[in-house]
């Protein structure tokens, strides 16, 4: 466990995605879905959509698929 004031930490979140850019896009899109009324998968004290989205990513409820051909 680290002493980060932010929970979950960026280090933990980056284990779930390819890079910081992907994390920003994924969390923003998920937050938008929550704003639009999507079901949430975690129980957190905050009612802020972005906080909920980040916690969902950290707990593995939200994934993404890289559609770019390499």
From Swiss-Prot:
Single GO biological process annotation from the record: DNA-templated transcription
InterPro entries (UniProt xref): DNA-dir_RNA_pol_omega, Pol_omega/Rpo6/RPB6, RPB6/omega-like_sf
Keyword tags: DNA-directed RNA polymerase, Nucleotidyltransferase, Transcription, Transferase
Record EC number: 2.7.7.6
Highest taxon of source: Bacteria
Catalysis: reaction(s): RNA(n) + a ribonucleoside 5'-triphosphate = RNA(n+1) + diphosphate
Pfam families: RNA_pol_Rpb6
Listed GO MF terms: DNA binding; DNA-directed RNA polymerase activity
Cited Gene3D superfamilies: 3.90.940.10
GO cellular component, as recorded: DNA-directed RNA polymerase complex
Coiled coil: none
UniProt keyword Oxidoreductase, yes or no: no
PANTHER family: DNA-DIRECTED RNA POLYMERASE SUBUNIT OMEGA
Function: Promotes RNA polymerase assembly. Latches the N- and C-terminal regions of the beta' subunit thereby facilitating its interaction with the beta and alpha subunits.
Family to which this protein belongs: Belongs to the RNA polymerase subunit omega family.
Alphabetical list of NCBIfam families matching this protein: rpoZ
Subunit structure: The RNAP catalytic core consists of 2 alpha, 1 beta, 1 beta' and 1 omega subunit. When a sigma factor is associated with the core the holoenzyme is formed, which can initiate transcription.
Protein's name according to its UniProt entry: DNA-directed RNA polymerase subunit omega
Species the sequence originates in: Clostridium perfringens (strain 13 / Type A)
Classification of source organism: Bacteria, Bacillati, Bacillota, Clostridia, Eubacteriales
Encoding gene per record: rpoZ
């Amino acid at each position: 466990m680290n002493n980060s004031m932010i929970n979950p930490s960026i280090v933990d979140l980056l284990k779930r995605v390819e890079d910081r850019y992907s994390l920003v896009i994924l969390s923003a899109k998920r937050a938008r879905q929550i704003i639009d009324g999507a079901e949430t998968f975690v129980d957190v004290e905050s009612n802020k959509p972005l906080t909920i989205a980040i916690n969902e990513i950290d707990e593995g409820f939200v994934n993404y698929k890289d559609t770019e051909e390499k």
